[in-house]
UniProtKB/Swiss-Prot annotation:
Residues holding substrate: 133
Family: Belongs to the class I-like SAM-binding methyltransferase superfamily. Cation-dependent O-methyltransferase family.
Record's keyword terms, sorted: Methyltransferase, S-adenosyl-L-methionine, Transferase
Enzyme superclass (EC): transferase
Binding site for S-adenosyl-L-methionine: 37, 59, 61-62, 67, 85-86, 135
Source organism phylogeny: Bacteria, Bacillati, Actinomycetota, Actinomycetes, Mycobacteriales
GO MF annotations in UniProt: O-methyltransferase activity; S-adenosylmethionine-dependent methyltransferase activity
InterPro entries in the record: Cation-dep_OMT, SAM-dependent_MTases_sf, SAM_O-MeTrfase
Protein name: Putative O-methyltransferase MSMEG_5073/MSMEI_4947
Keyword Methyltransferase: yes
EC number: 2.1.1.-
Domain of life of the source: Bacteria
GO terms classed as biological process: methylation
Keyword Coiled coil: no
Amino acid sequence: MASSAEAIVTHAERSISEDAIVAAARERADDIGAGAVTPAVGALLSVLARLTGGRAVVEVGTGAGVSGLWLLSGMRDDGVLTTIDVEPEHQRIAKQGFSEAGVGPGRTRLISGRAQEVLTRLADESYDLVFIDADPVDQPQFVVEGVRLLRSGGAIVVHRAALGGRAGDADARDAEVTAVREAARLIAEDERLTPVLIPLGDGLLAAVRD
């Protein structure tokens, strides 16, 4: 029998339904082997996009566009999503979902390239929300750059902060775990940030900038 905590998380994950457009994007993600956030994570991203104003949002890891669709659903009608992915084919497929959702081309800026390089070209303190869903070993660098991009009151959200529980296993010391712990340390020790770890998906580490 699942513990009460596990039951609550399971209930939360099952409580969100997706529309046909997001469901189709999720199927395409499965087809190309691109990871996609769970519906509950997507719903939380939509809420955070709305709470932070949703005018300018950065996403690291476009995938097939599932998380992008959720982010856009919470953003302002004139908000712009800048989404970065090293795989041009993933972005081509994501564009299909954005088009099906009626998202105008002026509301998305898809940048194909290494996020480590692209993020450094984005302006300081100009974004309401930064969502990171990429290789865990790169989380520390993405956190540093992501926090730099945030305006006052903006939020950073890092997915895969739990690594299936390995991040909390004292005996685990592989490269992914080490990087995830370092990203968490950077956020925890930044006095400008108020953080929280949310047990949805593979763990979400979120923080708001003062």
